[in-house]
Structures are given as C-alpha cells and as structure tokens.
C-alpha cells in the first residue's frame, strides 16, 4: 500500500510564513510550518503566494511515493519535510485472532493481527529525496481503525531543535533534526469508541508538549517536558471520543490550553493544570481544532448536530448557559475538517460535505450561508489559505481555489490523478 505526496508550489509546503491570529510563535516557527494547522493554528499564511493552477504536468515541483499509510499532515522546517507513516509488514502474530474470526464491529472494523513498523521520514524540501528515516517501533496495534483513519494520524511538531512524533498508543518519540533518537515515552493505550482510531496531534509551547487523549475509558490531558519527555502534569477528563488538537494562547497573564470536546470546552493553565474555565455546548465526536479571534476562542463540531461558539478568554469557572458566550450558531459546521480563520472571516464546510459557509468571526453574523462548492462532494482534509485565496481539496483529488470573500468566488479548479 502506498501513500503518495504530490507537491506543487500550490500545496501545503508553500504555506510557510506568518499569521497574526493566535499565540505568537518564535521567529523560526513563524517562517516555517512547524505543526498541524501552521504556526498560528489557523491554516493561513499571510506572505506565501502559491499558484492558482496545476495539473499532473504543470506546477508540480516533485512527487514521491511513501510506503505505508499516514493521514497526518507533513510539517516543514527550513529545507526539510517531516512526516509519519505506518507500514503493515504482513508478518502475522499467531497469538492474535484472525480478522475473519473476530466479531462483527461497526463499519466492519477489524483488529489487526500483523505487525506494523512505525516510521518517521525526513525529505528534502527542494527535491523530495529522502534524507533519513527512523523506525520507532514494530508492534501489532491493539485496536483497528475506521477506513478513513490509519495508525499514523497525528502530525509531528518541531521547535527547530527537536522533532516530536506521536503515534498514539504506539508511543511518543523525540529526535534531533538529523534523525538521532533523544527520548521515547509509552503513555499507555487509548480505547477509542467503536475502535475508530486515534488522531489528536501534539501541541508545543514554551518547551512543553500537550497531549489530549479523549476516548471511551479514562480520557486525559498530559503535559510533557519537551527536552526530557517527562510528565509535568496530567489531568483526567470526562469525555468520549474526540480528535480536536488543542490550541495554546496567553491571555491576561495566564497561558491557556484550550481543548474542545463534546462534554465541555475547557481552558487549562499550561503550567499548573488548573481548569480556568469550561463551557458546554458542542456536539459529539469533536474533531475541528479551536481558533483564536482577538479575545475569544472559537470552537465547533458537526457530528449528530451542528454547533459553533465564540467564548471569551477572560471567562472564569463553568460558564455553561450563563450568557457569557459571545455568540453561537447551530448550523453548517464541519465534522472532520478544521476551519480557516482569515482576516476576521471564518470559513468552514458542513459535516464532510462541500457546503460552504463564511461567518464574521467577531460577531458570528452569517456572511455566506451554506453555499455548494462546485466539482467536489466530500471533504475530509482541512482547507488552507494564502494571498487572499482559500484552497479546498475534495476526496476526489479536486482542489478549488476560492477568493477570500463574503460571497462565493471560484478562481480555479484543479485535479491530480491520485
């Protein structure tokens, strides 16, 4: 099985510059794409200028095949691209039940009985050639995953000194940027409801790594020291399945870690683990990542209902149904993709469909209401934006280039044969 990366000047690798919407990254981070959703967790670059047109023969800089499967986003630091993959060795563990002997599960999910190799890869950004690879572990995963997921779903993160790679129940691994192993941690097994698979990415701030594990047993949030990998604090959470990567923001003298989940949106103090505030109001299986707009955080969900809400960062305690929430809407929100926040405009799709909405991020007013995007039907990937354009890719390989506009403006439509 192969995962193929087709990198044009129009793709993710072009988005390697600064944004102004959330916490201030370091100078190096601002000039790179060092984590999931970029340096400001919004999916936006303010200075990149990717092309609007490409095809199999136009504006493709390089293309390489990657063994295995991994739905995590590659990250970029200077001249290197880092990504994760899990390769099925097809070597059978005779002590594990065969898939055909297992009970019927929802979505036909089977637990594997073969060993997987979990790899970290580094590619040359200019040529696509492999610079190094490191195998972190060989093991049989304890659970299966949904057909749209895999065993390498969390995106790596770097501070320019070290590379942090999270394979969920297969472990947390740290390397220097030349591939030298520095530390590793086994944080235990997660038991996802319906065996849907893991997917929350780590967040890095002030030499601290944040890991949220919301699943069907004891959910938790854990903060590790980035240099040593040792746990600084860990707090249990009452949550079911969720895959939303947290966002970190300093506000009013405190550094808040904001997590979105079905029972509560919560703000934790990064250094102590204290809950600063919490608020109910999202639906289940929360996957979209929070974004920061001014003095508010915007969270959303789109599974078995729709909810998007803007919560003041100055909140204290449990503010559920208190009237403190700045604004809320209950339609058109995404299930899997995260939103784009661009110059005060909040763009997102409905569920996993191609129905497109734009809100005023400050007021919550609807500027473009559930408008169908042409040429694509299903959307799982999160959109990215630059140069007053938004790039939305469907599962059929079609990418629409949209204008950053309160009305639908299609600039171009491009397809790769992947």
Show where each model-derived region lies.
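Short, aromatic- and cysteine-enriched interfacial helices/patches
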Residues: 2, 20-21
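Noncatalytic, solvent-exposed loop/strand surfaces
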Residues: 21-418
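Bacterial N-terminal signal peptides
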Residues: 8-19
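Bacterial N-terminal signal peptides that target proteins for export
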Residues: 1-9
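Low-complexity, intrinsically disordered regions enriched in charged/polar residues
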Residues: 3, 14-15, 27
